[in-house]
Design a protein with these regions (language model features):
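C-terminal motif of bacterial Sec signal peptides marking the signal peptidase cleavage site
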Residues: 22-26
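Extracytoplasmic/secreted proteins, especially bacterial periplasmic and envelope-associated proteins
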Residues: 74-81, 107, 111, 115, ...
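Short beta-alpha junctions and helix-cap segments that line functional grooves
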Residues: 146-150
Length: 173
């Protein structure tokens, strides 16, 4: 613990300042914009085959352009990694969540989220993932990850998230 003297001879301890500095490092984001979890503080620590491994090392989300269900090259790269992981660990079932940004009506965004979820589901099926392992759900604009009236928030909310529901049976390794 560091101490210093201030005028008047009173000792001031800087432990709180040091602790705050260390705590700020722990607040780093664990996901990159492409959905992979290789941001600062992530990677490698997750048990292979665990849900944390999927999120941190594979990436659980893909992003879409405004009013679109088209997969970008970044999205297909993430989905290829998801398909590979899901083939390696076949005991998992999962839900593909479709989301939209806050612009547009509730009904339209619900439909757009459903189409985004279906696009991801179809892509994973085309990569050999069994349909009986997948389900889709749309949240439309009801579950934003970022809330503000700005493109930086809207782009984070136009997404599909692959959520592992659970595992059954023996490990698929």
């Amino acid at each position: 613990m560091l101490t210093t003297l201030v005028p008047g001879g009173r000792a001031v301890r800087f432990a709180a300042a040091i602790a705050a500095t260390l705590a700020l490092g722990a607040c780093a984001k664990d996901q990159n914009a492409d959905g992979s979890g290789s941001g600062f503080g992530a990677g490698g620590a997750a048990t292979p085959g665990s849900a944390q491994d999927f999120v941190v090392n594979v990436g659980d989300r893909v992003f879409f352009e405004t009013d679109s269900t088209d997969l970008t090259s970044t999205a297909t790269s993430t989905l290829d990694k998801q398909a590979s992981w899901l083939q390696r660990y076949p005991r998992y079932t999962f839900t593909v969540e479709g989301h939209a940004d806050e612009r547009g009506t509730r009904e339209y965004n619900y439909s757009l989220g459903a189409r985004r979820g279906q696009t991801v589901r179809d892509y994973l099926a085309s990569r050999g993932i069994a349909a009986n392992r997948m389900r889709t759900i749309s949240y439309g604009k009801e579950r934003p990850v970022a809330v503000c009236n700005d493109i930086s928030c809207w782009s984070q909310n136009r997404r599909s998230v692959t959520v592992l529901d659970g595992a059954s049976g023996a490990p698929g390794v």
